[in-house]
Structure formats: C-alpha cells, structure tokens
Amino acid sequence: WASQVSENRPVCKAVIQGKQLEGLVDTGADVSIIALNQWPKNWPKQKTVTGLVGIVTASEVYQSTEILHCLGPHNQESTVQPMITSIPLNLWGRDLLQQWGAEITMTATLYSPMSQKIMTKMGYIPGKGLGKNEDGIKVPIEAKINHGREGTGYPF
C-alpha cells in the first residue's frame, strides 16, 4: 500500500477479527480508533475513564476489553486494543502503523513531475524497488567514469 499526499485522504483497509474495515492512516494518533457505528455489537467494550484528546475532546469513549487480531493492508499480522467513539471514520494510529512497518518517505525530486506521474501510473511505489516483488534496485544507477578504457573493447 502506498499513497501520495494529495487532496484525497490516505485510507486503507484492515481486517480486525475477520471484519474488514476501512480507516484513515493517521500518524498523529497514538492509538487506533474505531467509529462507534462500525463496532460490532457482540464485541465487548468498556467505558474508559480517560478521554480522547485531539482537535476535539471526545466525551463517550470506550475501549475494547480484548486484544484483537488484525491483518494490515498487505496481510501484516498485528494486534490492537482500539478505542471506540463517535467519529465519522476509523483512524489507524501509530499502534497499528508501526506493526505494519509503515514509512513516510519524502523523495528528492530527481525526475520531472511528468515522469513521476507516468511511473506511478505504471505501478511504481516510491521507496520500493522495481520488479514483481518490489525488491529490486531502489536508487538510480550512477555512471562510473572509466579512464583506462578497460572493458570497452578499445584496443590498447
């Protein structure tokens, strides 16, 4: 999973206890928060004494009484004990993002915006290598000056 910063919010899917949920990737949140209207009624939760503080303070806050099994966007195994409150969408916080191996990469603009757009459309993910398993070369190959003409086929 990769997402460039744009007008669209970075969302991804996770599977918690077999239930697929979509959430906003939120590196500013210490813990993951599930929207109350998406929390299954049969999953246990308890009211917390501590509130959630962010831009707005949430008043009715719950936490899962159990540590839940979770699969990240690339089936990364993880566990989470999320908070639950009335928010418009789920938030994947650093508690999950760290387990998923999330990275924030700010690449230097070595290439024109047009060439970057073309590469992205072709499936290139910034910070990953090229190739089927994204494990190929991650940085451009640098040309090396060969002053001795060795290996060029030039007669000495």
UniProtKB/Swiss-Prot annotation:
Alphabetical list of Gene3D superfamilies matching this protein: Acid Proteases (2.40.70.10)
Enzyme Commission no: 3.4.23.50
Domain of life from the UniProt record: Eukaryota
Occurrences of domain G-patch (ranges): 111-156
Keywords: Aspartyl protease, ERV, Hydrolase, Protease, Transposable element
Post-translational modification: Autoproteolytically processed at the N-terminus. Expected C-terminal autoprocessing not detected. The sequence shown is that of the processed Pro protein.
Function comment: Retroviral proteases have roles in the processing of the primary translation products and the maturation of the viral particle. Endogenous Pro proteins may have kept, lost or modified their original function during evolution.
The protein, known as: Endogenous retrovirus group K member 18 Pro protein
Organism for this UniProt entry: Homo sapiens
